Amino acid sequence: MACYYALKIIKDLGLPVSKRVRFIVGTDEESGWGDMEYYFAHNGLKDPDFGFSPDAEFPIINGEKGNITEYLHFAGENNGAFTLNTFEAGLRDNMVPESATAVFTADSTLAELQEKFAAFTAAENLKAELVQEGDAFRVTVIGKSAHGSTPELGLNAATYLAKFLDQFAFNGAAKVYLDTTANVLHQDFAGENLGVAYTDAKMGALSMNAGVFKFDRNSNDNTITLNFRYPQGTDAQTIKAELEKLDGVTAVTLSEHEHTPHYVPADDPLVSTLLSVYEKQTGLKGYEQVIGGGTFGRLLKRGVAFGAMFPDYVNTMHQANEFADVEDLYRAAAIYAEALYELIK
């Protein structure tokens, strides 16, 4: 809306311009970008020479890491003193799971399990619940969601749940699944335990989010969904090759959608113009940034993300009650109006 009204300001003022502006609105940014892929493949128009997406933060995002989702596959059969029936967590690969639930049977009483559970949740400062349902037990852990590009800002409910369950005598596929989640993925945001950690001087370090967990003992294809934000210097196949070395993983597959690393140099006129306007209007020093998140800015060779979140703003993106202050939208609209005019005058 801030960009829309910025264009309206330019139009209503009758300012002279020398370039055309294309206002492209996408609605699938969180679910694969199928709309943009279709649009650019079928619109019959030359791609814009440059552009920006108002889907990030100021002062600018002129670099975005690569983005690939890879799936670890596991068997399901397990029988023993402890048997894992189901384990589920997460809604999307690009979100830290806020809650996780497992159903299992155990050669223990509810009281015995609750004693261990109380000690674990107290030590980890977790909100959680353990109840008995017939012959089985249901355990739920509540964490904190966060954007998949910054998993360290969240609390992954799935890995904490696995950490609790991994102390018990599960066997077979359940043991492998819980071991992987609790001992390989837990708190490993850089992929060090996976053997895929990598850092580039310009784009920074690889990050990993374990986003979706699906396990059913009656299924022979259970999965853990891992989302990687990777810098230039590594790639999806290199990551896959390392994941295939994990003990007990039956297969590793890749998502159909991948974004390779994207970078527009700081001395590009687009970047320098946007930063100049930002500095003029805010009085703050502009600087380039590379992020693990993905924006529509990367759809253009000379595309960046520009706003609309300000540096002093509390980031609630992908969290409950996500919001933006109206006053900040006004501030952003003013910046966009001047920036757009400088680019098209």
Residue ranges and their predicted role:
Residues 26, 103-107, 227-229:
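Short hydrophobic/aromatic beta-strand micro-patches
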Residues 35, 97, 316-320:
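Short acidic, glycine/proline-rich loop/turn micro-motifs
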Residues 57-59, 88-92, 214, 291-295:
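Short, solvent-exposed loop/turn elements at beta->coil junctions and helix N-caps
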Residues 62-88, 93-144, 148-208, 235-250:
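Acidic-enriched catalytic cores of C-N bond-cleaving enzymes acting on peptides and small amides
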